[in-house]
Amino acid sequence: MQDTNGIENFVKNFAKSYYTWSNSKEAIEARTQAINGYLTKELQDLNVDTIRTDIPTSSTVTDVRVWSIGQSGTDTFSATYEVDQQIKEGEQTSNVKATYTVKVHVDADGDMVIVQNPTLAPAIEKSDYEPKTPEADASVDADTVNDATAFLETFFKLYRTATEKELAYYVSGNVLEPISRDYLYSELVNPIFTKDGDNVKVKVAVKFLDNQTKATQVSQYELVLHKDSN
């Protein structure tokens, strides 16, 4: 499988040059020289005069995010990326965000060149997906719920500072690794218990206070609890 880290860096560096400009002759020549280091001769010609000295704006790139890289032929890859620009026109400054796709050819020795000009693409939006919320199992009796809740509260109070040896008393098979952070346990949030043979599964959020940042940190866990006969 192709390592795409190099392609990602290549695209990011190209985008920083491509979307940065000002309307002086020297700056435009410097931009042209920079982007020509990434483009085929055909694309170099295509981009002549895209930024000219009579353009009323200047642009600074504030961020580039590569969202995806996929194979698009034997040795060609399609990269989708988002660019944040700060556009200045006279005394007015605005922030602009847009998503584009380019295609990158990669030689056998790893050399790269862009073979498709930046082409507008749909923005990457937040998905509407919501995971199905598990429902509490009525077969888990009240005593078991109380015992399990008490166990979880005890465990998470010590978990923040517990050593690997101390965790071994509560946890089997390194299911939870030591964190050794200055957290203060606050509360369990909406624990949902379900039967799993002789065991009980729990899905729970745990609130901690981070004593360094003073922010509340909410961690989510899915655990299987086993009660020893003794």
List each model region and its residues.
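Core segments of small alpha/beta cavity-forming domains
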Residues: Q2-T57, S127-S180
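Short, solvent-exposed beta-strand/turn "edge" segments of beta-rich domains on protein surfaces
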Residues: D3-E8, G70-S72, K195
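Generic short beta-strand segments
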Residues: K16-S17, T80-K88, K203-L209
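A short, amphipathic edge element
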Residues: T50-I69, P178-F193
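Non-transmembrane, low-complexity coil segments enriched in Pro/Ser/Thr that form solvent-exposed tails
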Residues: G70-A108
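Hydrophobic residues embedded in beta-strands of well-ordered beta-sheets
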Residues: D75-F77, D111-M112, D198-V200
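Short beta-strand edge/turn micro-motifs at domain boundaries
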Residues: Q92-E135, T216-N230
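Extracytoplasmic/luminal low-complexity segments enriched in Pro/Gly and acidic/polar residues
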Residues: T144-N230
